[in-house]
Amino acid sequence: MFPIIILISFSFTFLFASVTSGAGGVTNLSTCLINHNVHNFSIYPTKNDQSSSNYFNLLDFSLQNLRFAASYMPKPTVIILPNSKEELVSTILCCRQTSYEIRVRCGGHSYEGTSYVSFDGSPFVIVDLMKLDDVSVDLDSETAWAQGGATIGQIYYAISRVSDVHAFSAGSGPTVGSGGHISGGGFGLMSRKFGLAADSVVDALLIDAEGRLLDRKAMGEDVFWAIRGGGGGNWGIIYAWKIRLLKVPKIVTTCMIYRPGSKQYVAQLLQKWQIVTPNLADDFTLGVLMRPIDLRADMNYGNTTPIETFPQFNALYLGPKTEAVSILNEAFPELDAKNDDAKEMTWIESALFFSELDNVFGNSSDDISRLKERYMDAKTFFKGKSDFVKTPFSMDAMMTALVELEKNPKSFLVFDPYGGVMDKISDQAIAFPHRKGNLFAVQYYAFWNEEDDAKSNEYIEWTRGFYNKMAPFVSSSPRGAYINYLDMDLGVNMDDDYLLRNASSRSSSSSVDAVERARAWGEMYFLHNYDRLVKAKTQIDPLNVFRHEQSIPPMLGSTQEHSSE
């Protein structure tokens, strides 16, 4: 159990003076860190600096999207790895004292690199939480405390060490950091049964811009509401989450069913899928991942029709194999599920099975300790976009999607099913609003390995074109988007008088403009919850210390009041 400490006092002389971003600024920051017992950091190397390999090894370790690894991308002045909550508090205060912008990195999976790149021109640091990754499970209360740097895989593994009938509902990527994942909601294979990861958070420890360590009571219900689904990098730094453990059976069933074929054949399957899956029992999740080509060319499916599209139906059923196959065949006979398509295993084995740790779907390893791994060998360049679907796709819509998918062999399309408990949780329970009325969510995803800007632009433009083609068929007014699939195409906080730095110097009118400009994408991510998030941001971080290109802006009126206290 983590101690609940509301305020940590240090002997800081807190001078918010402007500091030159050159060598003097770095010296001031490093001196401040050392004086407050923070020694685990690496400074951007000078030309002849022998420690450059350490800096770049740290930078690259959790840099998951290679689009942001190019030499011309902005680099952090310092990478800091706090080892304790005291060091984390000192880090925040030292960065503020020396006027460095803070980027917080947990697992480094930000789709737009916001945890390790800043584009507003300010000198910035990365506060990397990988050393703060402890998970403490208490079976008596059926809860666990997970530090913000713990990955989803580490949480899963820690739970499995003490119980084979408890679990946590979150995503399939084990190297994803819990700090960011839960902050954005956290959809996963058990969300139809238990809701999002953020729905199971019962308390949290947040370090704010003043260095205060706040639990749920101390931060207040408005801020506690906001940090669950309101997106990472906005409110402060999550030191730890307290999560509720969820009861699961000892045996669950996984299925991966491949039905490659012509676009017409696959479109007909998908049309039935979208009607069936939202109405399945809560215990059953049946998602779809589609690729334009068969990446498993050595497999013989006995299909005599031309293979134009390769759909993979992924299922998790919280029960035995016989029931799973029976349910599928009764509800979705067109899929023609066989006993051989299903496997019984424990819940933790299913987490490994769907983990893609070996860059394949259906991990064959039985070493569940691999879920603790933080490093991804198979890194790529990628771009993703998202949608929500409220009305069943027509045949025209399905064919449009499959035709666009076929244009890029280095891509996939994901349909995540909704319904179940997701229909029953209020759209205002936490900041994540996409609940009742959604049939499924869509992810458009391109990945590539060419270190060529022209090729990168080609793949990115394909993703944008696909997204634009699907506009008539998805949610509208506003068109919904998932904050964990961050998408800078929707807009950024970098227009004229709204630069992310120097929040306290902006006029009241520019603050209003900033809030209204951010509404363009803020309401796509958060719908009617956007205004409440602005209020929470103004309450917890009025000076906009924690920010990025798509962060929630504060209203300035409270900033001025705060500054005059």
From Swiss-Prot:
InterPro entries: BBE, FAD-bd_PCMH, FAD-bd_PCMH-like_sf, FAD-bd_PCMH_sub1, FAD-bd_PCMH_sub2, Oxid_FAD_bind_N
EC number(s) recorded for this UniProt protein: 1.1.1.-
Swiss-Prot/TrEMBL cofactor(s): FAD
PROSITE patterns in UniProt: FAD_PCMH
GO molecular function, a single term: FAD binding
Modified residues (Pros-8alpha-FAD histidine): 109
Coiled-coil ranges from the UniProt annotation: none
Function statement: Involved in the biosynthesis of pyridine alkaloid natural products, leading mainly to the production of anabasine, anatabine, nicotine and nornicotine, effective deterrents against herbivores with antiparasitic and pesticide properties (neurotoxins); nornicotine serves as the precursor in the synthesis of the carcinogen compound N'-nitrosonornicotine (NNN). Catalyzes a late oxidation step subsequent to the pyridine ring condensation reaction in the biosynthesis of alkaloids.
Protein name: Berberine bridge enzyme-like C-2
Species assigned in the record: Nicotiana tabacum (Common tobacco)
